[in-house]
């Protein structure tokens, strides 16, 4: 199938972040497993899994921390190039959310090679590369597997001054909440999958999801 005729969302059981495990299931998986070392006072780990932040943070000295995050999901739009852009934006923006700046990214690609042509995956990667270029970082490699449904995302590294490190548990009563993007893209992505989204709404949602949260 050619990339200009396929509808990627039809190969996805749930659009975008809708394919995440439920909090209950994730808690059941993680509870028996110790996956960070914050209890160890000698560990350079500043932010691990316990606070459910957007990225892990490791003290690398000189007042700076290395940020590490990964994010991938099933198609949230039908256009392969835009899917790559949105996936890359989602992963890179986790670094910005922690107060840092991205330095490098590597790709995570799962592709049903018996259902979707390699050229479609190339379009996804091209979209991601464009977004990485916009963020000023290289898409420096990655890993791919043959699976039954398409997934794509990035693992991204970044740097942050520790004094500027932002965590999601620091909000105080009375703080002002700023939204950097409008709400509702999840509803629109579900409508896309079911063929019920209006073209103007799709374009607005895609533009929002492709915009880096810098």
Model-derived regions, located:
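Helix-biased detector of long, well-ordered alpha-helical tracts
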Residues: 1-214
